[in-house]
Amino acid sequence: MFDINLIRKDIATTKEKMLNKKVPSNLFDQIFDLDVLVRSLMQQEQNLNAKKNQLSKEIGILAKNKDPKLQQTLDLVNNIKNELQDISLTLSNKQDELNKLLLVIPNMPDDSVPIGNDENDNVEIKKVFKPKKFDFLPLAHWDLAVKNKLIDFDKSTKITGSRFIIYTNFGARLYRALQQFCLDMNVKAGFSEIWAPVIVNQESLIGSGNLPKFADDLFKLENSNYYLSPTAEVQLTNLHRNEILKASDLPLYYTALTPCFRSEAGSAGRDVRGVIRQHQFHKVELVKLCKPEDSFKELESMTRQAESILEALELPYRRIVLCTGDLGFSSAKTYDLEVWLPSYNAYKEISSCSNCTNFQARRAKIRYKETIDATTELVHTLNGSSLAIDRLWAAIVENYQQEDGSINIPKVLKKYIY
């Protein structure tokens, strides 16, 4: 959730920074005015309660002494109670209104994030491995999949519909091998493996920042408070929702493999062939919880972890830093890793590593204490793909194809495929 103290302290600077993230300035004026009203109502409520409590003490004395002012004081207390009911109702409504506005405002971008409008203004940091030059015309992964019977597109459409995949034969074994390889790499790097439910509740999605703003991107289970999770970031981030952690337990590192479900609203006509954009896909996720002063260092090491998998597989990739206009809702800073796909003659996103600072922690109430007597502070949360399995599968198939259409595989995968 957006930190309202930023608006209270310096609304002008907040407006300027958030305009770079395409948030209209008048929204902050609304929040500022509502906040002033809410705090005024809270003060009125507090004053009236204090007055009521004082009069209640006096009533006992007046009754004991049979003072003629007793009835007048009783009437006054009843009037205060009625006034308190009205104020409490108004306060509750205005607090809800304020919270709803705060829930749809994205995280503030870090000062190190380049200012820009969209993906065209993202900044390339580095490239690793040059794209392979083939001595033949390389095939796209969807053509290689048909040629080698790695995917059955027709049956997946028959069973479910468009944007779903059935991997078969060697294609299925490669898919499984990539999942295990990514998990093994993450566990060896110190991440604790979690096997989590794929159905999550509304509170978890609010905590991660997916709700209420991105409801159209989610699959909701009818007549329930349950959703199919769009990413294991949701489950892993919410492991410690409504908890106060010990500072000595931080940082916490988690990794999980889950199927992910997205409606891909607004993606009609994009990446219609192959496995790049699906309603259901598998992803290995990383999540970190840490102290605020460590979060940007943790972002660098998380991104390096995802890169190490691409490097072990010897896949050409590049790292970019997202500009303010392309930054995700919950993120203060994001690195994208893009793998080279010959079929696109371009780099395509395969990992997104983000520092969400205290944005998710505020929504999910994840805090920590340095000592028992210390005040609580919000942790910082980070998340990253390590990696998106379907896109990784496509990258292996395309970059390791042979002239006869067969698929070689990286040496590090050979022990996983039998």
Curated annotation (Swiss-Prot):
GO terms for cellular component: cytoplasm. L-serine binds at residues 231-233, 285, 385. Coiled coil: none annotated. It catalyses: tRNA(Ser) + L-serine + ATP = L-seryl-tRNA(Ser) + AMP + diphosphate + H(+); tRNA(Sec) + L-serine + ATP = L-seryl-tRNA(Sec) + AMP + diphosphate + H(+). GO terms for biological process: selenocysteine biosynthetic process; seryl-tRNA aminoacylation. ATP binds at residues 262-264, 349-352. One of its GO terms (molecular function) is ATP binding. Catalyzes the attachment of serine to tRNA(Ser). Is also able to aminoacylate tRNA(Sec) with serine, to form the misacylated tRNA L-seryl-tRNA(Sec), which will be further converted into selenocysteinyl-tRNA(Sec). This is Serine--tRNA ligase.
